[in-house]
Amino acid sequence: MDLLIKTLDGNEVGKLKVSESVFGLVPREDILQRVVRWQLARRQQGTHQSQGRSDVSRTGAKMFKQKGTGRARHSSARAPQFRGGGKAHGPVVRSHAHTLPKKIRALGLRFALSAKLKADDLIVVDEFNVKDAKTRMLVSCFSKLGFDNALLIGGNEVDLNFSRATSNIPNIDILPIQGINVYDILRRSKLVLSKAAVEVLEERFK
């Protein structure tokens, strides 16, 4: 299958042949959901914690004598049933990350690429290079191309001027090809790949 290559001015400059096994799959939502959940779980800080009965600042002395009061027997005032006591089974500092097979992760990325192409939301641009880091010029180019909410994926290195010019445009993200991931692809309506990025993806999944 062939993909059209455009310039930032919107002109067509050729076609790029890509494999069906990377860009032509039928997307599976269950795989995409698994990969996104895996990514977001790894991103969670897991620093939540509440004070248990051993953490609260309160006396550990027996509240009142065992017998003779007619009341239920109690020991520590730190017990969770009392006001000011510790939390029972509260959150603790932990990692929320879980494992996901490498093949499933790779498959999820291919499904995400295929889903964008199937929805006509994948565009290939010859290169992400500008002479000056001028945001106004790129905003004009993006509006012509319909990039109002897009993820841009460059080659192994992203042009510094281009990166600076896009940094303060809302709803536009730019990443090098090493940073491509399912979550960022799906959270933006358009996926814009440089020609170099497509070649790297083809080589990776060959």
Swiss-Prot record:
**This protein's record includes keyword Cytoplasm:** no
Chain intervals for the UniProt region annotation (Disordered): 42-93
Q: Which Pfam families match?
A: Ribosomal_L4 (PF00573)
Alphabetic keyword roster: Ribonucleoprotein, Ribosomal protein, RNA-binding, rRNA-binding
Q: Which domain of life is it from?
A: Bacteria
Q: By its UniProt entry, which InterPro entries does this protein fall under?
A: Ribosomal_uL4, Ribosomal_uL4-like, Ribosomal_uL4_dom_sf
GO CC, one annotated term: ribonucleoprotein complex
Composition bias of kind Polar residues appears in 42-54
**Start-end of Basic residues biased regions:** 64-76
Q: Name one GO biological process term.
A: translation
Keyword check for Nucleus = no
The Gene Ontology terms for molecular function here are:
rRNA binding; structural constituent of ribosome
Q: What does this protein do?
A: One of the primary rRNA binding proteins, this protein initially binds near the 5'-end of the 23S rRNA. It is important during the early stages of 50S assembly. It makes multiple contacts with different domains of the 23S rRNA in the assembled 50S subunit and ribosome.
Family recorded in the similarity comment? Belongs to the universal ribosomal protein uL4 family.
Q: Its quaternary structure? A: Part of the 50S ribosomal subunit.
Q: Could you tell me what this protein is called?
A: Large ribosomal subunit protein uL4
Which species is this UniProt entry from?
Bartonella henselae (strain ATCC 49882 / DSM 28221 / CCUG 30454 / Houston 1) (Rochalimaea henselae)
Gene name for this UniProt entry: rplD
